[in-house]
Amino acid sequence: MIKSIINEKNIYNADVVLVSAGYDKTASSHKGTKDGPKKVVQHLHNQVEFWSRKYKKNTNDFVKTAHKDLGNLNKLNPEAVLKKIRTTCDQLIEKNKFIFILGGEHSVSIGHFQALVGKYKPKDVTIVQIDAHCDLRKDDSDYSDNPTNLAHSTVMRHASSLGYPIVQV
């Protein structure tokens, strides 16, 4: 019986890499999203249905999935967080891996968006955002004593400025 969707230890042998980016330093309200990746991964070990009706077999039979945890990102400043995420994504994209970023707050996506620009034309990639907020702010100066233009509330502004078409739901 398959117990986990994470079925490959070596990220370079995997088809899909789940990248845990637990970070919530620029969250505007309650903190705790930094713990999201850990909780998601815990449930992926025993709460996922693997059977594919289309292929009539378990997806784990033909998709290798690995996990990379970037550690405690809250100890870093926003620029260092995005650099770490971008560097990780650059390395994985170079090896043609499909990347899932498990955040943390929305700003962790910026590093991934930046890495994708190196491989794909932004106009050929559409970013679909499902959120109650547009996240198009210039910075977080209206709710932070230490404002940054890399806050979670700026993520879609960054996507748009990189040239990505965005669809907001």
Identify the residue ranges that each predicted region occupies.
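Conserved alpha-helical scaffold segments that buttress catalytic/binding sites
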Residues: M1-V169
